A protein has these predicted regions:
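Amphipathic, small/basic residue-rich leader segments at the start of a protein or domain
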Residues: 1-99, 109-110, 121, 125-129, ...
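Glycine- and acidic
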Residues: 2-6, 31-36, 53-57, 69-74, ...
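A short core secondary-structure module
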Residues: 123, 127-188
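A glycine-rich, basic-preceded beta-loop-alpha segment at the flavin cofactor/substrate interface
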Residues: 142-144, 207-252, 272-293
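Flexible, small-/acidic-enriched active-site or ligand-binding loops
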Residues: 184-210
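Accessory "access/gating" subregions that flank catalytic or transport cores
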Residues: 213, 301-355, 360-363, 367
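Alpha-helix capping/hinge segments and adjacent helical runs
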Residues: 341-434
Length: 435
């Protein structure tokens, strides 16, 4: 573009956001979702609610916090084993170790199963060799990468044994900067440059050229590689293993959903207050003009969306309760987890699309005043726009919801005899007819 990749205002914004993140880490607010033995509070629900609250302020801080504690920290917590927790979580929670979540590539976003970055095991040195085989396989749009991150949780195709056959996508911890902040040997880091919004987040690209990391850096909760390269996993089916691993990261989707709802509330507060104060037209002979909110056209412009925000708010509260229950369930009920993933996917899509639509409606309802930066619509529009894309493209997420519902129906039908199926269909037909 015409804008330089590094301008002073963006650098200042990034520096401020990093300072705020460190302050939050010192306060203990950002560690609530982690185990108490590592400095957390074992409170997934309070963690999500704290995160959502940041949407009332600078959304760059919200996203930066999400990358550091939700994505990078969440990958280590949910995909790593106890030794990873002991080594990394305390420093991560205190923001002494800043990290990235390197999943998306230039050529693959939604289709994570086909990412191109490779991690090839070398039994002679007991190391994984991390490599970017082409430009489409570089890690792209990665938060914390361009400036501040020192380690990346890299999702890559794991290759073990004599063949080039992949074991599927796994996550490996890769140091990307040394203590002085310089890129590690074989790691190329670049800045994504100017974005539509979220200027306080340092999104960057990562390319790996035969970068070696110890065998222990594989996050091995679900799959292990022995010293001789033998691969083992408690989940034999590679597709099921992949979706189980991704399913543990559902908290990010739930968090973005809540953040979108809260950002929408900010826009609606401004617009409704403006509508109650601003006067325009009125009956002939009246002493003063009527407020905008007196007019049904203005009410219809704002109030149905406001009602929907209330509905989404309460739906989100229920989703957070479900998330907390599922992640504190020692039995690990697969069905409950699948239902949670379906709910989170659907609500995230609905809430973020609602945010994009409603913030624009609120801006228009404030007239020229809505176009002034001081009234926050510029930042709200620019910073929330990508919410419909990250943590899952909304259209793809709705397809995930459809798949989840069909799977659920199939499960119910399998448990029914012919009479039961007839009763089930009849009940649903009656229900739809009544609606």
């Amino acid at each position: 573009g015409n804008e330089p990749a590094h301008d002073s205002s963006r650098e200042d914004h990034r520096e401020r956001v990093l300072g705020w993140l460190r302050e939050l880490a010192e306060s203990g607010e950002t560690g609530k979702g982690f185990p108490s033995e590592y400095g957390g509070e074992d409170a997934v629900d309070r963690s999500v609610v704290s995160f959502e609250t940041l949407a009332f302020g600078d959304l760059s801080l919200l996203v930066k916090v999400g990358v550091q504690f939700g994505l990078f920290g969440g990958a280590i917590l949910h995909l790593g084993s106890e030794r990873h927790h002991e080594e990394y979580l305390p420093r991560l929670i205190r923001a002494e170790l800043l990290g990235c979540f390197a999943m998306t590539e230039t050529g693959h976003g939604s289709n994570v199963q086909e990412v191109g970055t490779t991690a090839t095991y070398d039994p002679e040195t007991q190391e994984f060799v991390i490599h970017t085989p082409g430009e489409q396989c570089r890690k792209d749009y990665i938060g914390n990468a361009a400036r501040d991150g020192h380690m990346a949780a890299v999702f890559c195709q794991l290759i073990t044994g004599d063949s080039d056959e992949t074991r599927g996508v796994h996550c490996v911890l890769v140091p990307i900067r040394d203590e002085q902040g310089n890129p590690m040997p074989g790691v190329e880091i670049s800045d994504c440059g100017a974005k539509l919004g979220l200027d306080g987040v340092d999104n960057g690209r990562l390319t790996f050229d035969q970068v070696r990391v110890p065998r222990e850096n594989l996050l091995d909760r679900y799959a292990q590689v022995a010293e001789d390269g033998t691969y083992t996993s408690s989940i034999e089916n590679p597709t099921k293993r992949f979706f189980t691993m991704l399913g543990t990261l559902v908290q990010g989707r739930v968090s973005v959903c809540g953040a979108a709802i809260n950002a929408t509330k900010v826009a609606q507060v401004v617009a409704v207050r403006h509508g109650l104060e601003r006067r325009q037209f009125g009956p002939p002979g009246a002493d003063e003009e009527a407020t905008l909110m007196t007019y049904r056209t203005h009410q219809r412009r704002l109030l149905p969306d406001l009602a929907k925000t209330y509905a989404l708010h309460f739906a989100q509260e229920g989703l957070v309760r479900d998330l907390h229950a599922v992640f504190n369930d020692d039995d690990g009920d697969d069905r409950r987890r699948r239902e949670l993933e379906t709910l989170a996917a659907g609500l995230k899509a609905i809430a973020t699309w609602h945010a994009t639509h409603t913030i624009q409606q609120c801006r228009e309802a404030c007239g020229g005043a809505g176009y002034l930066r001081g009234n926050r619509f510029a930042a709200l529009k620019a910073d929330t726009d990508v919410f419909t894309t990250f943590e899952g493209d909304n259209t793809v997420l709705l397809q995930l919801v459809a798949k989840g519902m069909l799977t659920g129906y199939r499960g119910e039908f399998e448990e029914l005899n012919t009479l039961g199926i007839a009763a089930f269909v009849a009940a649903n037909v009656v229900e739809r007819f009544v609606e």
